[in-house]
Amino acid sequence: MDKVQYLTRSAIRRASTIEMPQQARQNLQNLFINFCLISICLLLICIIVMLL
C-alpha cells in the first residue's frame, strides 16, 4: 500500500513539474472562455424563454 502511495505521489510530482507549452495553455484558456460564454448565453436564453 505504501508503495502505491509513493508511486502516485511521485507521478503527481512529475506531472506538476512538467512545464506546459505556452500554446497549449493559450488553447485551454480560449476553450474555457468559450465554454463560459456559451454557458452564459444558454442561461440568458433559458431566462428569456421562461419570462415570455
UniProtKB/Swiss-Prot annotation:
Residues bearing the modification N-acetylmethionine: 1
Protein location: Endoplasmic reticulum membrane; Sarcoplasmic reticulum membrane; Mitochondrion membrane; Membrane
Residues linked to a lipid group, S-palmitoyl cysteine type: 36
Gene Ontology MF: a single term: ATPase inhibitor activity
Family: Belongs to the phospholamban family.
Function: Reversibly inhibits the activity of ATP2A2/SERCA2 in cardiac sarcoplasmic reticulum by decreasing the apparent affinity of the ATPase for Ca(2+). Binds preferentially to the ATP-bound E1 conformational form of ATP2A2 which predominates at low Ca(2+) concentrations during the diastolic phase of the cardiac cycle. Inhibits ATP2A2 Ca(2+) affinity by disrupting its allosteric activation by ATP. Modulates the contractility of the heart muscle in response to physiological stimuli via its effects on ATP2A2.
Annotated protein name in UniProt: Phospholamban
Organism: Bos taurus
